[in-house]
């Protein structure tokens, strides 16, 4: 039995999802009495300049670089077994070796496809269990390595895809993607309506615009939706202050039709009262929507994992996918007027969701490493005034 195991969680700041999953797992380990947990952005710490450039290109894939990202995502899939695999496998290796020597972790978890650890195991024979937590509803070969001990995945669909490319079924566990614990608590919606000054007698359309301008024509969309009877539009701008200020002028015209927020810490509260949501198809956002059974309208997925996520939710009947700006208003308005369709989508979301994914992942890892978890009950937090 490992007494007080040290856990190293490797992640990367490409979008917020991978880091959020890492933090959720860290909190869950601590909740179960495992205090020695380190979260590390291996690529950012190893090669900050290269990481900054690639993060910039990643964000540009939402606007001017979609074809470039398509080539990267699907191209790497085809040539992964060649030279690029060797280069990528050793990216961050120097920093990793230092981490392993100094921190001496008992367990390593990846929430980003970092294969430096399993590659180091292969080359040096070091003995350390490695776990990959996949953060999308699809799989890319870059996640796969023979020296990974176990994979935790979103659905049985992802498991089937992995088995098809040669991963033994017994190494794959369907747990769902870890989400913030607030999404799994019970909250009185009446308090939410009061807190955010929302109309209980109207349907609510939530638009998650994001900090990087990845959702286009937001102001024009809001103007169109403000004319729809019995609808209140709620826009979360994230840290995009320019967008927030631009939309606040619209809100002043009719605050019953439009509510604008910047960064919302407890965004699960808005999920709980919305009729449907326009967003990008990131794996974590979709998992959170599934947890609260929120029908989603997925805006112009980028080729790659976003597109794969969108197609999966569309096939399951849980999402409407928008591929052209001209479709957004008409398809959204039609959905909002179709209560039967909205209910069917909520049921589809319910069928996708697996409860308490972070807890199941942590319990499985601790059990495999013969570490006894100490359970501390989670208390339901009061609704925080944490939005701007």
From Swiss-Prot:
Parts forming coiled coils: none
This protein's record includes keyword Manganese: no
Pathways involved: Glycolipid metabolism; diglucosyl-diacylglycerol biosynthesis
InterPro entries according to UniProt: Diacylglyc_glucosyltr_N, Glyco_trans_28_C, Glycosyltransf_28_UgtP, Pro_diacylglycrl_glcsylTrfase
Catalysed reactions listed for this entry: a 1,2-diacyl-3-O-(beta-D-glucopyranosyl)-sn-glycerol + UDP-alpha-D-glucose = a 1,2-diacyl-3-O-(beta-D-Glc-(1->6)-beta-D-Glc)-sn-glycerol + UDP + H(+); a 1,2-diacyl-3-O-(beta-D-Glc-(1->6)-beta-D-Glc)-sn-glycerol + UDP-alpha-D-glucose = a 1,2-diacyl-3-O-(beta-D-Glc-(1->6)-beta-D-Glc-(1->6)-beta-D-Glc)-sn-glycerol + UDP + H(+); a 1,2-diacyl-sn-glycerol + UDP-alpha-D-glucose = a 1,2-diacyl-3-O-(beta-D-glucopyranosyl)-sn-glycerol + UDP + H(+)
Superkingdom of the organism of origin: Bacteria
Gene3D superfamilies: Glycogen Phosphorylase B
GO molecular function: 1,2-diacylglycerol 3-glucosyltransferase activity
UniProt keywords, alphabetically: Carbohydrate metabolism, Cell membrane, Glycosyltransferase, Lipid biosynthesis, Lipid metabolism, Membrane, Transferase
Compartments it resides in: Cell membrane
E.C. code: 2.4.1.315
Example of a GO cellular component annotation carried by this entry: plasma membrane
GO biological-process terms attached to the record: enterobacterial common antigen biosynthetic process; glycolipid biosynthetic process; lipoteichoic acid biosynthetic process
Class in the EC hierarchy, top level: transferase
Task of the protein: Processive glucosyltransferase involved in the biosynthesis of both the bilayer- and non-bilayer-forming membrane glucolipids. Is able to successively transfer up to three glucosyl residues to diacylglycerol (DAG), thereby catalyzing the formation of beta-monoglucosyl-DAG (3-O-(beta-D-glucopyranosyl)-1,2-diacyl-sn-glycerol), beta-diglucosyl-DAG (3-O-(beta-D-glucopyranosyl-beta-(1->6)-D-glucopyranosyl)-1,2-diacyl-sn-glycerol) and beta-triglucosyl-DAG (3-O-(beta-D-glucopyranosyl-beta-(1->6)-D-glucopyranosyl-beta-(1->6)-D-glucopyranosyl)-1,2-diacyl-sn-glycerol).
Family: Belongs to the glycosyltransferase 28 family. UgtP subfamily.
PANTHER family with a match to the protein in the record: MONOGALACTOSYLDIACYLGLYCEROL SYNTHASE, MONOGALACTOSYLDIACYLGLYCEROL SYNTHASE 1, CHLOROPLASTIC
Protein name in the entry: Processive diacylglycerol beta-glucosyltransferase
Lineage: Bacteria, Bacillati, Bacillota, Bacilli, Bacillales
């Amino acid at each position: 039995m490992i007494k007080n195991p040290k856990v190293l969680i490797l992640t990367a700041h490409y979008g917020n999802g991978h880091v959020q999953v890492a933090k959720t797992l860290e909190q869950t380990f601590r909740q179960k009495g495992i205090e020695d947990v380190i979260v590390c952005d291996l690529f950012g710490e190893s090669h900050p300049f290269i990481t900054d450039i690639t993060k910039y290109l990643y964000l540009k894939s939402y606007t001017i670089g979609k074809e470039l990202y398509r080539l990267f995502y699907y191209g790497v899939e085809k040539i992964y077994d060649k030279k690029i695999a060797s280069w990528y496998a050793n990216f961050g290796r120097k920093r990793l070796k230092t981490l392993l020597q100094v921190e001496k972790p008992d367990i390593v978890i990846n929430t980003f496809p970092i294969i430096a650890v399993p590659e180091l195991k292969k080359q040096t024979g070091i003995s350390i269990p490695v776990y990959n937590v996949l953060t999308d509803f699809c799989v890319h070969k870059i996640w796969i390595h023979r020296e990974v001990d176990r994979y935790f995945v979103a659905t049985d669909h992802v498991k089937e895809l992995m088995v098809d490319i040669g991963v033994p079924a017994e190494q794959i566990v369907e747990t769902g993607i870890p989400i913030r614990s607030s999404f799994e608590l019970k909250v009185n919606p009446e308090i939410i309506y009061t807190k955010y000054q929302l109309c209980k007698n109207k349907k609510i359309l939530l638009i998650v615009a994001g900090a990087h301008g990845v959702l286009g024509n937001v102001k024009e969309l809001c103007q169109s939706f403000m004319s729809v009877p019995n609808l209140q539009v709620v826009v979360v701008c994230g840290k995009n202050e320019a967008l927030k200020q631009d939309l606040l002028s619209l809100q002043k015209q009719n605050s019953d039709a439009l509510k604008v927020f910047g960064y919302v810490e407890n965004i699960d509260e808005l999920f709980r009262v919305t009729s449907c949501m326009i967003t990008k198809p990131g794996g974590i956002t979709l998992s959170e929507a599934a947890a609260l059974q929120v029908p989603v309208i997925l805006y112009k997925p980028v080729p790659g994992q976003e597109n794969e996520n969108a197609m999966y939710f569309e096939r399951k009947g849980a999402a409407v996918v928008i591929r052209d700006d001209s479709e957004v208003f008409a398809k959204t308005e039609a959905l909002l007027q179709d209560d039967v369709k909205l209910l069917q989508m909520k049921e589809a979301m319910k069928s996708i969701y697996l409860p308490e994914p972070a807890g199941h992942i942590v319990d499985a890892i601790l059990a495999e490493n013969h570490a006894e978890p100490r359970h501390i009950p989670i208390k339901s937090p009061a609704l925080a005034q944490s939005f701007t």
